Amino acid sequence: MKFLLSIGLALVTFTLNAQTPTAAAVLEKAQAEAKADGKNVFVMFHASWCGWCHKMDKAMNEPDMKPLFEKNYVITHLTVLESEGKKNLENPGADKVLAQYGGDKGGIPFWYVTDADGKFIEDSRAIVDGKKAGNVGCPATEKEVDYFIYVLRKSSGLNDSELAEIKARFLKNQ
């Protein structure tokens, strides 16, 4: 009986510890790491069903791309908008963060960049005529990729050659 009780207690403890972290906890961890490493934070909202989210992750994690992003950013993900059977994957509070940054109106992936203190730098809503416009998400068209490069130039130490490599790679997303 004690053995079964021990197993039950262990399972409850494991289940409690395995809960999806809150959006606040994810962002605090990323900011602490960015502060320690002298980087900015790149936050991407995604979901398990989102093909464009997977495409963006794949592009950013390719062997030629990953070092360019990782030397400049702590990249973190917040899961939102999951289907009914996968709501457990969502980070509690991530929907509120998405809305706070205006990403709740344009689909995912939605991303934004902050400095290590959480000060906003830029997001995935392109600027048209001096105003925020639609979400470029995973950049693929010439205009979307140009905007992505603008954000990277503004928020990183990437040089022109590195930015050209990133541009060429993301244009392959079409």
Annotate each PLM feature.
Residues 23-41:
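A short beta-strand-turn-helix
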Residues 147-174:
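C-terminal partner/receptor-binding element of secreted or periplasmic proteins
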Residues 45-60:
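Conserved redox-active cysteine motifs that mediate thiol-disulfide chemistry
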Residues 11, 59-65:
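Intrinsically disordered, low-complexity boundary segments flanking structured domains
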Residues 1-21:
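Bacterial Sec-dependent N-terminal signal peptides
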Residues 41-43, 50, 75, 111:
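Hydrophobic beta-strand anchors of alpha/beta hydrolase catalytic cores
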Residues 20-24, 91:
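A conditional alpha-helix N-cap/helix-loop micro-motif detector
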Residues 28-31, 63-66, 70-152:
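Thioredoxin-like thiol-disulfide oxidoreductase module
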